[in-house]
Amino acid sequence: MKLELSLEQWQQVKDFAIRNLNLSSISKADCDLSEYIPYYNKWLENNYHADLEYMVKHGSKRFIPNELVPGTNSVIVATLNYLNRPVNVKTEVKRLRTTSNIADISIYAHGRDYHKVMKKKLQQLGEFIDELTGGHQFRVFTDSAPVLERPLAEKAGLGWQGKSSMLMNKAQGSFFFIGVIYSNLDLSKLPDSPKHQDSCGKCQACIKLCPTGAIQPGKMIDSRKCISYLTIENKGSIPLELRDKIGTRIYGCDDCQLVCPFNNYAPITTEKDFQQRDFLVNKPLLELLAWSEKDFDKYTQGSAIRRIGYAAWIRNIAIAVGNSPFNQDNIQALELKKLEFSDNQLVLEHLDWAINKQKLLS
């Protein structure tokens, strides 16, 4: 006999998630992801996954939760807002079109590493359910395994996948993390949350304003062009033809979200762990370029930024300094950094590019 939750218990779970864990929303979904297989396979066929080989591996486990975690009968899906400042589309568009010497870091990385924050909350939620039922077997995921978080959230009625492939929600916008619990509970008898209709309509804002043209038809992202991929997941050289377009974005890119009309109303997070770290936000590029590896380790402790490593961090900043308004100090700082990376050809290549770019701007 499968373990179930009563409607009253399910309400207790939702109340605990919102009130005690500060999660933004919670729902449940079944395990049938078959409708998403053609979409995913087409994305792979187009080579939009770049060199992310883990997106190819694991076979059917990505689409059949019970294969990844045997005994899974249902999926519990939760979201957690991370937006730490108001967004106004008109203001953002103007800012994004203005060149500056200030580093641009994706909002999600301003605070504590979301993997740690979200997983801790989901684990507490799973344990709370176990207290209610006894025998609750579960495993939590947040962007860390072959799990289709966005499709599962869409099935759970927490939003729709927009043209940017981000999960959208009229009330929450898109600035939220998604976490899931693969559970042995049978939640099929509980009422489903109503599905969200795709409300993007004819809007093309994210497509038109993507700096590198990474947003493709069919709600697909070409990772090979995506600045988030290029500055975070990419371990090698950033393609020459895309360097100018990266601007001063040194870690990730929020452009497709910042220009989305639904984010005009996105709520500000109340999660303390996601508040801005002063030493990462609105910082002059040269100040960050001057960091030593020891500084990098110190200031990125507990941050998702730590994952890319110091060399990639300097690689990214070099591109941004090259793209910033001309200043002789930029060239001097880049030349000085070359001494530190004299045995690292990858970083040297980007430092040299930035120096030449600054000379062209002079």
From Swiss-Prot:
Sequence positions that bind [4Fe-4S] cluster 2: C210, C226, C253, C256
Pathway(s) this gene product operates in, as recorded in its UniProt entry: tRNA modification; tRNA-queuosine biosynthesis
GO cellular component: cytoplasm
Compartment(s) where it occurs, according to its Swiss-Prot or TrEMBL record: Cytoplasm
Listed GO biological process terms: queuosine biosynthetic process; tRNA modification
GO molecular function, one term: epoxyqueuosine reductase activity
Superkingdom per UniProt: Bacteria
Residues bound to [4Fe-4S] cluster 1: C200, C203, C206, C260
Recorded catalytic activity of this chain's protein: epoxyqueuosine(34) in tRNA + AH2 = queuosine(34) in tRNA + A + H2O
Active site location: D143
Enzyme Commission number: 1.17.99.6
Subunit annotation: Monomer.
Known function: Catalyzes the conversion of epoxyqueuosine (oQ) to queuosine (Q), which is a hypermodified base found in the wobble positions of tRNA(Asp), tRNA(Asn), tRNA(His) and tRNA(Tyr).
Record family assignment: Belongs to the QueG family.
The protein, known as: Epoxyqueuosine reductase
Species assigned in the record: Francisella cf. novicida (strain Fx1)
Gene name for this UniProt entry: queG
